[in-house]
């Protein structure tokens, strides 16, 4: 009886299903369509790159940069998607470009003169709207840059040869300080101390503890790389950044003490002209109310870290290449003997060292240290047919660019790549345009002087089984040897014992 009563209900429900199903399915279909649209709405972008995927794409993109390092991640994306790629860092659209025409356009124009990075990270470093390296305030940057341009050209450029020769020879005379029991020379420590000494002699002229300051510079640079693109949440958890904050504070405090000593010497000097240099110009501008104390200290810090930070590694890579290529060493030594003979190096010799200059250029092309440049678009633009919105982050992968276009043997180390003049749009180790490296001319002089001075006294050799290509490196803000895995050491053999003793 009961079963019979239920049968009609069963039949009625069954008959209702076809009518109810379309109504219930419609919202599901709409939701599915919406999600599909969101998932793919960025796929229509004209710029190649990973998909947006409901925000998963930007998250993975940023994580990849944090995990691999800036330089390595740029190489990954350019290799995967081409030479003009759209990715994300901190949720912001970022272009990774290794195309010479695009790079030329960006470096040339003033509306790409700003950089990008974590505001919190740059504040920790003292670089937020201060100094010149990562200052993102165009007005403040333009006010500070002339101090660097003046210091890195003119009289300082002329004095660099004498200062650098003296510094190199003084440190080579004390080579035992950076040589272990096996006779292996820690080349990076040697270069860092030498370059810090030369920079101090030219720009600050205050006695300092080279060993101590060099270690602090290394800690500062490690913190800079670690904090530059960290997400904001990282800075909310104090213990995560405590180590880096300590490293930053140590160098900033040390530079602050040196700057105070410089102020004291300036304001108690009988003859001010005896103290005129980069730091003096900054301090006098501070006294006139044109700069703040923070501006002065940060500019001194950035001037003091520039050479030990990048040029030291650059020269180390060059020495490795010389050791690996005997014919190149022979050509360099022949030119040194032809130009100098037995006399000391002079400023007039710089232009005559053509083989040395080609070697330096090829070394920077083949094994760069600074292989990426970070910029931000300050207005809407179109680059090589691609629309670029105001506020877009840009990373120029110049290290990859130098191995893609123009050079006859891009993947080999050979001086043939610079036998003919190279148009500067294809080779930009120091950049050009409004935000080019202010020290590019003095850097070339320093490298020539250091290499000539060292090679005249020593034959260099890598440790057995070591070569530049198989060396463990980290490629983040800059490309450095991984010092945590192996000592950046070489063997120095005197070329002429009597000549060495003369120094």
Swiss-Prot record:
Pathway: Steroid hormone biosynthesis. The keyword Endoplasmic reticulum applies. Heme binds at residue 437. Its EC number is 1.14.14.14. InterPro entries: Cyt_P450, Cyt_P450_CS, Cyt_P450_E_grp-I, Cyt_P450_sf, Cytochrome_P450_Monoox. One of its GO terms (cellular component) is endoplasmic reticulum. One of its GO terms (biological process) is female gonad development. SUPFAM superfamilies: Cytochrome P450. It is a multi-pass membrane protein. It is found in: Endoplasmic reticulum membrane; Microsome membrane. The chain crosses the membrane at residues 19-39, 51-71. Expressed in placenta. Highly expressed in follicles (0 hour:hCG), followed by a drop (12-24 hour:hCG) and by an increase (30-39 hour:hCG). Highly expressed in corpora lutea. Also expressed in granulosa cell layer. Not expressed in theca interna. Its main location: endoplasmic reticulum. It comes from the Eukaryota. PROSITE patterns: CYTOCHROME_P450. CDD domains: CYP19A1. Residues 294-324 are annotated as: Substrate-binding pocket. Its cofactor is heme. This is Aromatase. It comes from Equus caballus (Horse). The lineage of its organism: Eukaryota, Metazoa, Chordata, Craniata, Vertebrata.
């Amino acid at each position: 009886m009961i079963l019979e009563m239920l049968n009609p209900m069963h039949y009625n429900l069954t008959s209702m299903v076809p009518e109810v199903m379309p109504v219930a399915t419609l919202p599901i279909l709409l939701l599915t369509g919406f999600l599909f649209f969101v998932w793919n709405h960025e796929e229509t972008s004209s710029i190649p790159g990973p998909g947006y995927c409901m925000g998963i794409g930007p998250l993975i993109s940023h994580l990849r940069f944090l995990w691999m390092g800036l330089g390595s991640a740029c190489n990954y994306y350019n290799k995967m998607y081409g030479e003009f790629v759209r990715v994300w860092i901190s949720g912001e659209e970022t272009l990774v470009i290794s195309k010479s025409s695009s790079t030329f356009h960006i470096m040339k124009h003033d509306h790409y003169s700003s950089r990008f990075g974590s505001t919190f990270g740059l504040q920790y470093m003292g670089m937020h709207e201060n100094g010149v390296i990562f200052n993102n305030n165009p007005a403040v940057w333009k006010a500070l840059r002339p101090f660097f341009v003046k210091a890195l050209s003119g009289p300082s450029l002329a004095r660099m040869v004498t200062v650098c020769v003296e510094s190199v020879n003084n440190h080579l005379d004390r080579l035992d300080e950076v040589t272990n029991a096996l006779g292996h020379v820690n080349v990076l420590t040697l270069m860092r101390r030498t370059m810090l000494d030369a920079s101090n002699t030219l720009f600050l002229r205050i006695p300092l503890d080279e060993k101590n300051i060099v270690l602090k510079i290394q800690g500062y640079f490690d913190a800079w790389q670690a904090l530059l693109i960290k997400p904001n949440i990282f800075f909310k958890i104090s213990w995560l950044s405590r180590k880096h904050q300590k490293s930053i504070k140590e160098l900033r405090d040390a530079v602050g003490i040196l700057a105070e000593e410089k102020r004291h010497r300036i304001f108690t000097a009988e003859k001010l002209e005896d103290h005129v240099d980069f730091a003096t110009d900054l301090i006098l501008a501070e006294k006139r109310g044109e700069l703040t104390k923070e501006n002065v200290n940060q500019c001194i810090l950035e001037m003091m870290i520039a050479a030990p930070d990048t040029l030291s590694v650059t020269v180390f890579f060059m020495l490795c290449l010389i050791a690996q290529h005997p014919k190149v060493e022979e050509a360099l030594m022949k030119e040194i003997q032809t130009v100098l003979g037995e006399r000391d190096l002079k400023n007039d010799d710089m232009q005559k060292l053509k083989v040395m200059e080609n070697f330096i250029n090829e070394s920077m092309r083949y094994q760069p240290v600074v292989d990426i440049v970070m910029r931000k678009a300050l207005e809407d633009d179109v680059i090589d047919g691609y629309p670029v919105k105001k506020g877009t982050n840009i990373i120029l992968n110049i290290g990859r660019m130098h191995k893609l276009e123009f050079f006859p043997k891009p993947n080999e180390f050979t001086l043939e790549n610079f036998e003919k003049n190279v148009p500067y749009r294809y080779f930009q180790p120091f950049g050009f345009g409004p935000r080019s490296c202010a020290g590019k001319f003095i850097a070339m002089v320093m490298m020539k002087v250091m290499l000539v001075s060292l090679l005249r006294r020593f034959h260099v050799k890598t440790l057995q089984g070591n070569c530049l290509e198989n060396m463990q490196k980290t490629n983040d803000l800059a490309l450095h040897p991984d010092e945590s895995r192996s000592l950046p050491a070489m063997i120095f053999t005197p070329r002429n014992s009597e000549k060495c003793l003369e120094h």
